[in-house]
Design a protein with these regions (language model features):
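Mg2+/Mn2+-dependent nuclease catalytic core
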Residues: 146-257
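Acidic, carboxylate-rich catalytic segments that either coordinate divalent cations
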Residues: 261
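Metal-dependent nuclease catalytic cores that hydrolyze phosphodiester bonds in DNA/RNA
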Residues: 1-159
Length: 261
């Protein structure tokens, strides 16, 4: 397990990321031309890197996300004006690009919020999301030694960077969403979130039992959180779902970096 990265500028989602067999992040690599670039599957095969948990999960279909993207594109088409003489293809392209910017803005806000939370666990720097989260954790899981942004590599051939976990096997993941105040926590979660936490737990040696918590932070009201504790009996289900997906990922990519291979 590797120490956390404290730099906000380097605080990025682990999606599309790679790790070496010691759990060290290998998000970028210096190419033959001496220029640093993003690590590719070809690089991973050469150096025996493993994919991140979210890279594996990314091959899943995400109907809710695709529906959200479609809605954003439709909203853009209703709010934007088509220029005189502009082709339909050009207008559609502008609408799609505008809707993508909405998603990028949301992602940037999420990254900023994650960084504030991480900094709080590193040096107790106060912020609205951190203060709300630590109050919840101290109440429900007292006397824990929390580790923020620790990375790992599993012998099964995957790795990851965990938002927060304790040495006793409590795994916490932070998500940012809009307008969550009037929604039940159970309405905010998907099996994918449970799979992510179970994969982290398994990768850290908690194969059969782990406490898993998804904490949602409102992007517009960052001091408001909604917390969902996963049922214990769903851990084995989500673990097996992830492992099945991992096997599929290896077949699709024609690459198995596991130490059991």
């Amino acid at each position: 397990m590797k120490d956390n990265n404290l730099s906000y500028s380097n605080h990025t989602s682990e999606a599309g990321h790679w790790y070496d067999q010691d759990g060290t992040p290998k998000y970028t690599i210096v190419g033959a031309n001496g220029v640093e670039r993003n690590t590719t599957l070809r690089d991973a095969k050469k150096f025996n890197y493993v994919p991140s948990v979210t890279s594996v999960l990314d091959i899943l279909a995400k109907p809710s996300l695709e529906h959200w993207k479609l809605n954003q594109a439709l909203k853009a088409s209703m709010s934007m004006q088509r220029s005189e003489g502009e082709s339909l293809e050009s207008f559609m392209y502008r609408c799609i690009q505008d809707s993508k910017e909405i998603g990028l803005t949301a992602a940037r806000e999420g990254t900023k919020i994650h960084a504030m939370i991480e900094q709080g666990f590193v040096d107790q720097t106060s912020s609205e999301p951190y203060d709300a989260i630590i109050e919840y954790l101290d109440t429900n899981y007292p006397d824990q030694k929390w580790i923020a942004e620790g990375s790992f590599c599993s012998e099964l051939g995957y790795g990851g960077k965990i938002d927060l976990y304790s040495e006793e096997g409590i795994f916490v993941d932070f998500k940012t969403k809009d307008n969550i105040r009037d929604k039940e926590p159970s309405k905010l979660v998907y099996d994918e979130y449970g799979m992510q936490l179970s994969a982290y737990a398994q990768g850290c040696g908690f194969v059969d039992k782990a406490e898993r918590v998804s904490i949602f932070v409102d992007r517009q009201e960052v001091g408001y959180i909604s917390c969902y504790k996963w049922e214990d009996d769903t851990h084995s289900k989500h673990r097996d779902m992830f492992n099945s997906l991992l096997s599929y990922w290896k077949l699709v990519k024609n690459y198995d970096p596991s130490r059991q291979a």
